[in-house]
A protein has these predicted regions:
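Conserved structural scaffold segments of CAZyme catalytic domains across common CAZy folds
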Residues: 19-22, 106
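Carbohydrate-active catalytic/glycan-binding domains of CAZyme proteins
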Residues: 31-344
Length: 344
């Protein structure tokens, strides 16, 4: 395990000032090309890609941003803290296709939000209400309907201590034929551990549920996957993709030519510092989740103090959407690079 090394940046300030001044003379303005954007002290709660835009929430208000960080739409009266965009068959989308977003909030509601292709509000409806807080909804299109999950927490939320009493986290699965009426289907997993940052992929008749499992908030955590071959009726035992040697925060897991690629933000090089010591890593697996390589540090720009929301390919480029200094400044950043360049 590598030891986290702190860099004294005091000597960098004068040099950076000289560089900015030189750039101002050359280009007529100050600043350095960021290959994306930076929104300082944005303090958003969640963020996801929605096509070639971004959906995020600030003070539980939902906003749509373009890839330059400009707000192009917002929705009065809607409150969201956790969001999930259903993006099946994105490449074949047309102007008549609508976006469907699952979101949940501190009113113990899980909603389905429907937007037009250009982000006009069509309908917002409550899908499920719970007795206690429910986080991390997921929406999946099936052949004959939809599946929806949320993670309900009974007891202590985000227990901060290894000696504390953790709440029970239960990942509930619901089904619907019309996106309006939802029926309980099963509970995928229930643990007296934090179950967070879930995502589902549906491929060739199999559902894959990816998630983080940790004993206490910001402590060491596993990344796991469970599978279902009967439309979500029953699920396998968890397969551990990354062990709990660091605070691993899952962002996305996508199919590749050889199997799977998992993106996480992790304090692997600075264990114990959680978000403030985290960087983006990618991990490759065969189709059966046998590891090929793990904890490969991404060459993404500004890869320090990262809480990664999502990594996504758009028009041949890798796009990384993340918070910097999540627990303090909570800046929102987008960084882009050519596909393949994120590898060391």
């Amino acid at each position: 395990m590598k030891k986290c090394t702190k860099i004294n940046k005091n000597w960098l300030v004068p040099a950076l000032g000289v560089l900015l001044a030189a750039l101002a003379l050359v280009f007529g303005k100050t600043g350095i090309s960021q290959n994306g954007f930076t929104l300082n002290q944005y303090h958003n709660a969640d963020a996801k890609f929605i096509g070639d835009h971004i959906i995020t929430s600030v003070d539980e208000g939902i906003r749509i941003l373009d890839l330059e960080g400009k707000t192009v739409a917002s929705y009065d009266g809607l409150a969201a803290s956790w969001m999930y965009v259903m993006e099946d068959d994105v490449e074949s989308r047309g102007p008549e296709d609508h976006w469907f977003i699952a979101y949940s909030n501190h009113a113990d509601e899980t909603h389905i939000l429907e937007l037009t292709a250009d982000f006009q509000l069509v309908e917002d409806r409550i899908a499920v209400t719970t007795d206690t807080l429910a986080i991390d909804p997921i929406l999946v299109k099936m052949e004959d309907g939809w599946l929806l999950t949320n993670t309900e927490i009974d007891g202590t939320i985000n227990n901060p201590s290894p000696d504390g009493d953790n709440g029970i986290y239960s990942v509930h699965l619901y089904s619907s034929a019309d996106l309006k009426t939802w029926e309980p289907l099963t509970t995928i997993i229930s643990k007296k551990q934090n179950l967070e940052d879930g995502d589902i992929r549906y491929l060739d008749g199999t559902l894959y549920y990816f998630f983080e499992m940790e004993d206490y908030d910001k402590g060491p955590s596993k990344i796991c996957v469970m599978t279902s071959d009967d439309q979500g009726g029953s699920w396998s035992d968890p397969i551990v993709l990354l062990p709990n040697v660091a605070d691993n925060e899952m962002a996305s897991c996508e199919q590749t030519d050889y199997g799977w690629r998992l993106y996480v933000s992790s304090d692997y090089a600075c264990v114990g510092e959680s978000y403030q010591g985290a960087s983006v890593y990618y991990n490759d697996y065969k189709e059966d989740f046998t590891p090929i390589s793990t904890y490969q540090r991404s060459e993404m720009p500004d890869n320090e103090s990262v809480r990664l929301y999502e990594a996504k390919e758009i028009d041949g480029q890798m796009n990384f959407l993340f918070a910097r200094n999540f627990l303090t400044d909570c800046d929102l950043l987008l960084r882009t690079m050519e596909k393949g360049d994120e590898m060391q």
